[in-house]
Amino acid sequence: MRSHVWAHGCDHAYLAEPGPGSVPPPPVEADAPAWASAQRAVHAGTQIVEVTLHGTGTGSVVLEDLEVRVAARRTPPAWNVYQMSQGCGGALTPAAFTVNLDAPRPVLRPVAGNDSGGETGRVIPAPAFPMRVSAAEPVVLRVEAATTGCDCDWSLDLRWTAPSGTGTLRIDDNGRPLRTSAATGRPAYGFATEQGRWAR
């Protein structure tokens, strides 16, 4: 499970308490978990989670449904926003499930993606349950969560069926809830490479 996925591999924001003079330069995406942990930072506004699922035996597993569980909603902390990019884009927008964490009963909504890298854009079909996976045919689930009103603790519950029985897989941050916080109105900083510092 990857919980620090950036849009287009370069666009993301974190909310952190330290002032800009105490925060190191932005990392590359692969180093984001360690960077965020060192700053005690949380995802600002949005969080993208990717989970790779596959079977373990000779048979296939049917993924039946995926549900969002919001465990807590708090007032967003009055911290600073640190932008990991000064603007970037990409030709590929993956298909995903999106969810509004502010909704009273958050529901995942499938959204189609697109690949505009060629002469003609190609639509990537929206994901849909049920899905069948096996050891040889994995599936990557992408969830894009957003909030404008809370400091949210949340997780995902995946229901599955296999020849051996049924079950529910909890998807979280190594036993802890995932955490995404609204950042509306907070001071936002981008990294000024020429000056080697964060600036508004």
Please tell me what each predicted stretch does.
Residues 1-43:
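Extracytoplasmic low-complexity, Pro/Thr/Ser/Ala/Gly-rich segments
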Residues 34-44, 52-61, 76, 132:
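Short, solvent-exposed beta-strand/turn "edge" segments of beta-rich domains on protein surfaces
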Residues 46-48, 94:
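Extracytoplasmic
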Residues 48-55, 64-73, 155, 159-160:
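Extracytosolic low-complexity repeat regions of secreted or lipid-anchored proteins
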Residues 59-67, 77-80, 109-112, 155:
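Short, hydrophobic/aromatic beta-strand segments
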Residues 72-115:
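Long, charge-dense
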Residues 97-121, 126, 153-157, 161-200:
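Acidic, serine/threonine- and proline-rich intrinsically disordered appendage/tail regions
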Residues 117-151:
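Low-complexity, intrinsically disordered segments enriched in Ser/Thr together with acidic residues
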